[in-house]
Amino acid sequence: MAKVRVHELAKELGITSKEALSTLKDLGEFVSSASSTIEPPVVKKLRSAYPGAGKSAAKPGSTPAAPAAGRSAAPKPAAAPSPRAVAPTSDAGAPAPGPAAGRTAATKPGVAPTPGPAAPTPAAQVPAEPKAPQPSATPGSAAPKPGAAAPKPGAPRPGNNPFSPKGGSAGSRPGARPGGRGGAPRPGNNPFAPSQGMRSGREDRAPRPGGPRPPAGAGGPRPGGPRPAAGAGGPRPGGPRPNPGMMPKQITPAPQPARGRGRPGGGPGGGPGRPGGPGGRGGRGNAQGAFGRGGGPRKGRKSKRAKRQEFEQQHTREIGGVKVPKGDGTTVLRLRRGASLADFAEKIRADVADLVKVLFTLGEMASANQSLDEETFQLLGDELGYKVQIVSPEDEDKELLEAFDIDLEAEEANEDEADLEPRPAVVTVMGHVDHGKTRLLDAIRSSNVIEGEAGGITQHIGAYQVPVEHEGEQRRLTFIDTPGHEAFTAMRARGAKVTDIAVLVVAADDGVMPQTVEALNHAQSAGVPIVVAVNKIDKDTAAPDKIRGQLTEYGLVPEEYGGDTMFVDVSARNNINIDQLLEAILLTADAALELTANPHKAARGVAIEANLDKGRGAVVTVLVQTGTLRVGDTMVVGSAHGRVRAMFDENGNAVEAADPSRPVQVLGLSSVPRAGDSFLVTDDERTARQIAERREAADRNAQLAKRRKRITLEDFDQAVAEGKLDTLNLIIKGDASGAVEALEDSLLKIEVGEDEVQLRVIHRGVGAITQNDVNLATVDNAIIIGFNVRPAERVADLADREGVDMRFYNVIYDAIDDIENALKGMLKPEYEEVELGSAEVREVFRSSKWGNIAGSLVRSGLIRRNAQARLVRDGVVVSEHLRIESLRRFKEDATEVREGYECGIGLGSFNDIKEGDVIETFEMQEKPRV
């Protein structure tokens, strides 16, 4: 069956083309316009959407088919009398064929046998058929339907003879009166006339007001009824178009009309045609032949390739001169971190070269295999109609493991409670480095060393287990030795929550110190319960109650004050109340946590620390969280893999198996993993190697695509407007406690009007910016404000690598103005400080003429004469607004001295220079803010 156009099918169903297009869209079929053709399955779906209209449209063509069942060509002429059944009963509704039609029939002897079996007048008026009364029941409402819009069925065609004075389809004019103009010449079939004997399709399809019109110059109605159609015209109303196999075989002398394209109403002049229709319509899209002859035959069906190209053109978008597949705005594309344009092109089945051009049009330059960041993919997705989702590292690693049939969440969910056994609690000790934390750890270890192990512990691996007797039951506790709290922050930044309880050590004679507050912030941010150990109570200046009062300000309320935090007064030097501290840890674990694990499966856990030993290779301290780790197991730790060759405990003894919460040293890995990387045991070494290689590739791509800055003051207001951020986190470091307090109070008083944005200071402290500050800013997406302090060299590199924004001020009002403008979105162009280099003072030479001369070694960059400089001593800025007044190398004046060379630096009248100071040089460059 030939394909149907949308507007034709809509007319057949009695609906508008717009309604048909909307219905097709709801059915999941995307059609560009009403002139598009649709396949038979789509036609069937649209017909089924309008069951009532489909039946009424099909009845006129199916009713007269019964008397002509014996003839294969009968279905074509059988459609002619059907409009009589739906037309209003009148004398003018059934006129006899006129003389012109009679002459046409007389000159065609081969057509004579056709009308015999096809006379359908009695069959069309049979009242017993249930289908016949439906079209005739509402003649007024049938006007827009195809049956009612067809030309008058009973009117004879005067023929398309160009020499006839009545020639043409005069009856197709909707405004003509029933009387007609008998002798009016019809110039429509003049080959030199522009109309070419054809009325417009709109006029042909318009219903006749006032009923059918008798033919021009015709006599009264013939008693024999209307002349049956003998030609092979176009598709009957409500039915499919005919194909060449349905053409009547006996009609050979007359020229045939265009295949399947004519409306009901016959072919060209002199040939067979249906009565009453406009003559010689060659069909939509075909050229009309001269003298009423049909145009050339229509081309055959489109090939699958042509159909596919047409479909792709309908669903593509042209950007920058190239066409790429477009989405509907809801299509989700999931991309891994560090994905490239080639990955994006593979997802949408497009040419990667076209995407490179599209991205260039959008103002971004990238190659096909270059790793891109999330913002670039979001820009490209918004332009093409796709929602881009960058897979998080956790989900990416989960999908990677699922590719090897490893589902950790499913394993945990399917755990049988009968297999779960209690496990020891994991405890991390934190606090100020001078408050006895290390001595307390040594006291706990020494008081629990196995008998016969004289001399204490032989080596420290950073984690150990001690037995504790509690209520007559032998229990165990696992302690993680983290010097400072750097490793703890790094593990939290990578999402490895291995700590169950945190012990905060505070010296009773010193009180709460800046690093104590910093450790407290880390523990609270990790969401673990805290036990406070008040150390050094044996000193005369100890004030444990003062410590309790100070920590109450930070949310740690002691139990004796009505809170839920346990405070234990201990002395690590004299071993006072060590057992009570261990008991408090156990009570906190029992009250707040339910610690169980399944030891009867492959081991899973996390790496606490790792180092490279010259004799043993990669040495990794791991903490088993679930399962049991055995010697000989194949394991993968982050991007490292290998077979466990040996395991050792905290005492250096060889261990064959490690159960949950047991820390051990592992030998045999291929490389040194990072602290906080998770590990798992695999079935074979090949699987472990493939997992490690894929993790390494993913990390490498993520690093390539990583932006230098996460959130800066310049783009803070844009992030707020997009709903990505509603809180600005700050870390304030200064050279004096009073300055830090004043800066914090001033910042918290900033008013931002109706669009209020929360300002939160997550950490404040005195001293130089440390690595822990950068780690905390990385986790909480914070901005570091430095007031008269500078970071160390390694800290600056870490901040640059992690994308942390650090701002330095020496006037408090400048910091307040910058933060206020950031909150209000009113940042203006600024001057940017560009570092030139730094030099370390090795020796100070005193001169009565030039003052103090700093004999220095250039550590980085270069030192340039007349450049601006500052003097930094122990991480604190001693003097600002200095200038390199004199610069010499081996008693000769120099314009600049580069890295690795020694030089003499004079700072003019400033003489407060000491050995170990650092002279930093810089210049100010104007930087427009965008």
From Swiss-Prot:
Stretches with biased composition (Low complexity): 56-111, 121-162
Ranges for region G2: 456-460
PROSITE patterns the UniProt entry points to: G_TR_2 (PS51722), IF2 (PS01176)
Residues of the signal peptide: none
Residue ranges, annotated region (G1): 431-438
Biased composition (Basic residues): 296-307
Chief location of this protein within or outside the cell: cytoplasm
Keywords, ordered alphabetically: Cytoplasm, GTP-binding, Initiation factor, Nucleotide-binding, Protein biosynthesis
Basic and acidic residues compositional bias, start-end: 308-320
Subcellular location: Cytoplasm
Molecular function GO labels: GTP binding; GTPase activity; translation initiation factor activity
All copies of domain tr-type G, residue ranges: 422-596
Residues reported in the UniProt entry to bind GTP: 431-438, 481-485, 535-538
GO cellular component, one term: cytosol
Region of interest (G3), residue spans: 481-484
Positions of the UniProt region annotated as G5: 571-573
PANTHER family for this protein: TR-TYPE G DOMAIN-CONTAINING PROTEIN, TRANSLATION INITIATION FACTOR IF-2-RELATED
Entry function: One of the essential components for the initiation of protein synthesis. Protects formylmethionyl-tRNA from spontaneous hydrolysis and promotes its binding to the 30S ribosomal subunits. Also involved in the hydrolysis of GTP during the formation of the 70S ribosomal complex.
Family named by the database record: Belongs to the TRAFAC class translation factor GTPase superfamily. Classic translation factor GTPase family. IF-2 subfamily.
Protein name: Translation initiation factor IF-2
Organism: Micrococcus luteus (strain ATCC 4698 / DSM 20030 / JCM 1464 / CCM 169 / CCUG 5858 / IAM 1056 / NBRC 3333 / NCIMB 9278 / NCTC 2665 / VKM Ac-2230) (Micrococcus lysodeikticus)
